[in-house]
Every structure is written in C-alpha cells, then in structure tokens.
Amino acid sequence: MSIRRLPEHLVNRIAAGEVVERPASALKELVENSIDAGARRISVSLSEGGLSAIDVADDGCGMTPDEIALALERHATSKLPDDAIEAVTTLGFRGEALPSIGSVADLTIESRVRGADGWHRRVDHGELVGEGPAALPPGTRIRVSNLFAKVPARRKFLRSARAEYAACVDVIKRLAMARPDIGFTLEHEGRRAILVAPDEQRVDRVAALTDRDLAQNSVAVDFRREAVSLTGVAGLPTFNRGVADHQFLFVNGRPVKDRLLIGAVRGAYQDMLARDRHPVIALFVELPGDQVDVNVHPAKTEVRFRDPGLVRGMIVGGLRAALDEAGHRSVQRPSVAALGNWQAGGLPTASSTAPAIPNGFAFGAAAERSGQGSVWDRVADFAPAPMARAEPAYSPPPQQASYPMGVARGQVAATYIVAEAEDGLVIVDQHAAHERLVLERMRRAMADGGVARQALLLPEVVELDEVGCDRLETRIAELAEMGLELERFGPKAMLVRATPALLGQGDVHGLIVDLADELAAYDEALSLKERLDHVAATMACHGSVRAGRTLSVAEMNALLREMEVTPHSGQCNHGRPTWIKLGHGDIEKLFGRK
C-alpha cells in the first residue's frame, strides 16, 4: 500500500485517542480552558458519570464567533503569543482539546464576550451541525454528549458510570485545590457533590476537598531553596490512608502524577508509615518555567525537571522539616466513635469484683522535669518491677502538672500507660513510643559521629543461610559505625561481639535475622547511611521495651517527658500512633453526660 495523507477527521480521532481517554479526560481539558480564560466561578454538571453528558460553564473572557470556529481547528490557541513553549504558564497550550473532543462526541460551544452578543456552534463527531446566536451571560458554556458513541471500539473500554464519575470527581478536586481563588461547583444527576467558594485559604480548600479533620491533623509546609519553593499541607503520619488517592501534587499550579514526586513523598515518610499506608498530602512546587518541561505527556499529567535531584531533595527535606515541627503530635480525631460500642453495664458481682489495686497498675510520685541531657540519662534502662524491689506498689498519686502528655496514673495490661493531662486522658502504647524514642536517639548518635557499643560478655552465634551471611559480611564496616560488631563465623553463621548500647539487653538473634532480611531488599550500590532510617528502625524495634513489661511510675513519666521533646514521637517507626487522647468532653459523652 502506498503512503497517503490521512483525512482530517481521522487525524482528529487519532489525536483524541491521546487526549481524550475517558469522560474525566474531556472534563479536565474543558475546566483547564475555563481556568485559562480567567474564570472566577466554574460550574460542572454530569450525567451518568459523564458518559451521557458533560456540561461546563464559566464566567471567563468568552470567545467571539470567529474565535469559536478557530478553536475547533487543530493546533489553534491563544496561549502561546510568542511561540515560547518553554515559558508556558497556562494549563493548556497545544490547541488540541476542543477539536479532539469534537471528533469523538457531540460538542456544543456557547460563548459571549462582554459587550457583545453570544454565539453557539455545534459539532457532532467532527461534522458541523449548526451555529447561530445564543443567549447567555458573559463567559462560555460547553456541552459534551454521547462520548465515543460512533467509536464503539473506544466506548467498550469505558468503565461503569460510578467509576467514571469517581474519576471526574478526582479531576475537579485536583483543579480546585490548585486554584483556591476560583469557585467550583460539581453536580451529578442533579445532586450537588462539590461546592467551594472562591478566595479560600489553601488549607481550608484542601481540607474541604479531602477530609475535614485534616486541618487539625496536619502541618503547614513552606520551604524554599534557590529559585524553587515548596508549600502545602502535610498530614501527620498517623493521619494516613490505605490507598494513595489522597496525595495531591502540583507543579506551577498544574496537577501532576509524577513518579519522582510520589517517590520523594514516600521517602520523607518512610520511617513513619507502614508500607501499606499512605499520607494525606497536598504539595505545591513552584519553579521557573525553564526548569521544568510540561510537554512530555499527551495529558500533561507528567513533567520532567531539569534538576530532579534538587526537587526530590527539597521535597524530602521540606516535609521532614515540617513534620519535625509537629513534635509529639498524633491524630486528634476523637476515639469516642470506636469506644461508643461499649455497653453500659451494671455493678460487678462480689465474685467478679477486682482487687482495689490491680496488679497491672503501679502508682508513685511523678518524675521531675529533666535538666540538661536526656531524661533517659537518669533512667537509662527500665528498673525492676515493684515486686522485685520489695517496695510498696501503691503511693498517693501526684498532683496534676502542666505536662502536654500528662502525668502517669497507671499501666494497663502491662502494655499501655494511662496518664492524666489538664484537658483529658492520654493513653500511650509503651512499646511503640519507646521504639520511636530509641530511633531518634540513634539518629542523634549517628549525627554526632557514631553509636556507642556495648560488648557482649559472651559473643553470640546467629545461624543464617549463606546468602544472608554474605550480605551482612559486606556491610560489617558500616554496621560497626552503628554500634553493631559482627564477624563471619563459618559459612552459615555470624558472630555478634557487640550491640548498640542504646538498645540495652535486646533480642540479638532476632535483630540479626531481621537485618539480613532488610539488606535483601536494598540496592547493593547504596550505602547503609543512605538506608539509615530502615536499619536504625529495625534496631530500635528490637531495643525498645516490649508490651507486657511492668514499669514504675518514674519510668512511665520519664518516657512521657521524653516524648514531649522528641520529634515524631506521635507515631512509631511503622506509622502507627503511639498515643491517643480522650478529652473531657469525649469522656462525658461516653457516660451520657453530654
């Protein structure tokens, strides 16, 4: 077959295959056009998730009749006046959206500029159907119906109306977050799904479109390096989700789903979230136009940075700095909903009455605030349980002090510390909290030149498979800087001579086995310092006090005081909360007083 020029309608359909993948793709292009037109309010109406109809109306600058006709031709645009694609500042610039949509759907455009009459033009799958005067306020209205009706090969790949509607909602959310100065309305089958007013604060806009509790469970991000700025809202690590749908990333006001940015976010949260949990976050990167290429993807959802290392480092560093300021904060969402399942019961019978002072509780004088150095300089290791010290397990409770984490009142199931604060009741998971404290202490020690070692009285032999031993052997020098002294002991064993002093009397065998497993997931080209958080987290887990360990009140208060001054103490190394608080109002609700 000889080479021939394709007809215009077929060219448009091919182009539409790249630009218009589903109703959400068409909606994105239309709303971006409205934003570029200077609209202050944008209204969207959907039918059957956009499969039947998409209506977009705005109060932007509008178009003249000649401009409407020109807008339906390929590569006709008003957004590149100087043909400087490297310095593009608008969301659209190729001039492909309207002709592409018009080639695979029934498209009607109504528009009016201020001081002139309105005009409409209708195109059905690339064929002009009609045009003429139209009555409408200044701005533009566009209706897309019967998408892919004459392209069955494409329509059969569309998903259900519910799935397509969800994709459309995601598009509007992202664009609305990018432009809090614009008001957005989304209706589906006559029901209003989104309504946000113009000129909102960014944090309020993000919270309104994601989770109302985000404002109370997030930190502001504001970081600058050279000509690049990073702003936004980052949820606390304990305020997480099981899917990554609540991560919103923007570059120069453009919503993107860029792997570099997603990886940077994951890196910033890596030791604060479990692998199957994801942060709630909205980040806005602003940088000069010549430092980023937005013309690398048909839908413009991916970008390419001139200096990706700078951007990634900035995101990781900026998020880390913001999360450090959160200190010991954890999710403040009341736990009353979960506790509401409790049923009020009658008084216990005589046979079931518990002792006046349960064995699982230990009361005593509260520890004083520490002076110079760490609280743990005074309580380096947990002291024996009260029974082992031959001292009374009960003494009058201390006076309530103005400590953010409260004063320890007891221990439940030898696992949870119960503390009384001025504004409620604090419950702390002792293992999770101590695990975070040990990790942060190891980080500080590494930053100061290395972790002190604690020699074992009798070196311990740990048997592993040969591959695991090989991995550990290649990292012996690096592990030594972290306080772990190893040497090869035959083909399938490692000899442990010293462990990090910070870990105390931990499970040496379990630590070595877990480290070997961690190293199996590493790129051999990376040093352990580049994976410090992973290695230190593994060590900290084995060096922290376990659930089931009875603590004295002094030990509990020492832990609470260090939590108050330690970054990220609100979540453990796996992203779980280390403490929760029940406010006085929450407790009163449980007892029906409110």
UniProtKB/Swiss-Prot annotation:
GO BP term (any one): mismatch repair
A GO term, aspect molecular function: ATP-dependent DNA damage sensor activity
Signal peptide: none
Function: This protein is involved in the repair of mismatches in DNA. It is required for dam-dependent methyl-directed DNA mismatch repair. May act as a 'molecular matchmaker', a protein that promotes the formation of a stable complex between two or more DNA-binding proteins in an ATP-dependent manner without itself being part of a final effector complex.
Lineage of source species: Bacteria, Pseudomonadati, Pseudomonadota, Alphaproteobacteria, Sphingomonadales
InterPro entries named among the record's database cross-references: DNA_mismatch_repair_CS, DNA_mismatch_repair_MutL, DNA_mismatch_S5_2-like, HATPase_C_sf, MutL/Mlh/PMS, MutL/Mlh/Pms-like, MutL_C, MutL_C_dimsub
Keyword entries, A-Z: DNA damage, DNA repair
Name by which UniProt lists this protein: DNA mismatch repair protein MutL
Gene3D superfamilies from the UniProt entry: 3.30.230.10, Histidine kinase-like ATPase, C-terminal domain, MutL, C-terminal domain, dimerisation subdomain, MutL, C-terminal domain, regulatory subdomain
Family: Belongs to the DNA mismatch repair MutL/HexB family.
GO terms under cellular component: mismatch repair complex
Domain of life: Bacteria
Keyword DNA damage: yes
